[in-house]
């Protein structure tokens, strides 16, 4: 994003009620965007049967969405700075609604994946813009931290409740209904945005960086395609090796080219701030772990245990319910005490959840299974507010939108990698089911446990005095 969001006059002129309405509208947009990352997971088995899709086709159904979000969030944010945030916000809602309609009408997996791309294009116009509006509407530091905490909590809640809502919809109305439900929500949000969200533009919008944008898409696309298709082509395939080489060259290009631009797509100097750079890595770790958990769990519950979609969704209640309680408390705790404790709790819960999932087998009592899922709920409830706060709080207001966009990019990249990696690990075992599937999933659970440990360690490393000083130096530079 860029230099200014809401002008001081506009911001200070908003009443507390108007600010609350703006926050609510932004949260509604995040609910549909984030929920569509997870709500689709519980519908995957039904989609696969109805559309005769392969495991890689199902992976792309999830990853086409999160990959586009990861690749174009920053571009959409800077575009909103130039042409107006409310305008881009409303266009994004309309594109998301149209994509949802087309997903619901899909006659085949190719159509569905293409419609998911359109959905994601709309989503890229909602995520960074809504966060920038929230961050700049609430100017008082404590008030801002609470608002960002609510915003982050809503994101986590939507991610957790997606499979539960999706299970009920699939059971009652079929898998297409998980897309159609977005349409009335989007329509209400478009009207409310027109009525209550003030239009704003940046005083100096960041210029479009086509080379940086292309390099980012090349890196993300090459890595994800290589991971997903490695199951069929093999890791030693010239195609797979070539894709990783292309990704490495893309990273080198970013490191060489971006620092030379006045308005780079990726503001690499922000990464000198330890809290900020740690927040990006933790966002990637968190959603990589949770994306892998959801992808494996929904298929385990339905394809291995034979549960109906609604029952599978209800088994994930222990993931969603803690978010309702923990996220608001975490937001207040971050505002009052900082992000250290929530990050350590979140990382520890994810690590324990991954480690304990190693004992899940085809006949493990469901009570024991859902008890383990509770750990993932604790993790999700605690992780989002401190990550969002760490990414933004140390930055000047002029960089808040860009910092938030990069944090969101880390989340979406994490989801994409989590689905790609977990699908590659369990894909060959899915047709066999039973013990073959649960044994193959051990690789996923070890990965999830390691990611949780990484979040806890980074939480400690990024909140000390030295880390805080690096954030202050970056903000002043």
Task: Name every feature range the model reports, one short phrase each.
Residues 43-72, 111-113, 305, 310-315:
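Extracellular/periplasmic helix-loop-helix junction of adjacent transmembrane segments
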Residues 47-48, 79-80, 165-173, 227, ...:
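Interfacial helix-cap and linker-helix signal at transmembrane-aqueous boundaries
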Residues 78-211, 363, 397:
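Helix-loop-helix hairpins in multi-pass membrane proteins, especially solute transporters
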């Amino acid at each position: 994003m860029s230099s200014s969001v809401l002008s001081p006059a506009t911001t200070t002129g908003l009443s507390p009620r108007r600010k609350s309405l703006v926050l609510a509208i932004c949260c509604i947009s995040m609910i549909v965007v984030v929920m569509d990352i997870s709500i689709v997971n519980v519908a995957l088995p039904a989609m696969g049967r109805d559309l005769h899709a392969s495991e890689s086709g199902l992976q792309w159904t999830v990853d086409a969405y999160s990959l586009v979000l990861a690749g174009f969030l920053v571009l959409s944010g800077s575009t909103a700075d130039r042409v107006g945030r409310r305008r881009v916000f409303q266009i994004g809602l309309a594109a998301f609604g149209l994509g949802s309609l087309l997903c619901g009408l899909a006659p085949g997996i190719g159509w569905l994946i293409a419609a998911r791309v359109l959905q994601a294009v709309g989503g890229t116009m909602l995520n960074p813009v809504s966060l920038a509006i929230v961050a700049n509407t609430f100017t008082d530091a404590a008030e801002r931290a609470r608002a960002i905490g609510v915003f982050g909590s809503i994101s986590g809640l939507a991610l957790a409740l997606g499979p539960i809502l999706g299970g009920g919809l699939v059971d009652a109305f079929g898998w297409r209904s998980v897309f159609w439900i977005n349409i009335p929500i989007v329509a209400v949000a478009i009207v409310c945005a027109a009525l209550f969200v003030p239009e704003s533009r940046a005083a100096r919008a960041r210029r479009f960086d086509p080379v940086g944008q292309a390099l980012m898409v090349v890196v993300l696309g090459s890595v994800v395609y290589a991971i997903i298709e490695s199951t069929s082509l093999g890791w030693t395939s010239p195609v797979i090796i070539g894709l990783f080489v292309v990704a490495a060259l893309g990273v080198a290009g970013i490191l060489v080219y971006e620092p030379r631009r006045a308005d780079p797509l990726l503001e690499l100097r922000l990464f000198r701030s330890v809290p900020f750079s740690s927040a990006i890595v933790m966002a990637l770790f968190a959603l990589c772990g949770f994306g892998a958990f959801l992808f494996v769990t929904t298929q385990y519950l339905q394809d291995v245990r034979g549960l109906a979609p609604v029952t599978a969704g209800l088994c994930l209640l222990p993931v969603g319910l803690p978010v309702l309680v923990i996220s608001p408390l975490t937001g207040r705790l971050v505002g009052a005490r900082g992000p250290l404790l929530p990050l350590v709790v979140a990382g520890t819960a994810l690590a324990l959840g991954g480690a304990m999932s190693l004992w899940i087998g085809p006949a493990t009592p469901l009570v024991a299974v859902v008890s383990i899922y509770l750990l993932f709920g604790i993790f999700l409830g605690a992780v989002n507010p401190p990550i969002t706060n760490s990414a933004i709080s140390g930055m000047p207001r002029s960089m808040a939108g860009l910092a938030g966009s990069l944090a969101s990019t880390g989340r979406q990249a994490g989801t994409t990698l989590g689905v790609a990696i977990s699908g590659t690990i369990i894909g060959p075992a899915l047709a066999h089911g039973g013990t073959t599937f649960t044994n193959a999933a051990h690789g996923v659970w070890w990965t999830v446990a390691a990611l949780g440990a990484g979040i806890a360690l980074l939480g400690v490393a990024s909140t000390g005095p030295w880390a805080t000083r690096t954030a202050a130096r970056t903000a002043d530079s």
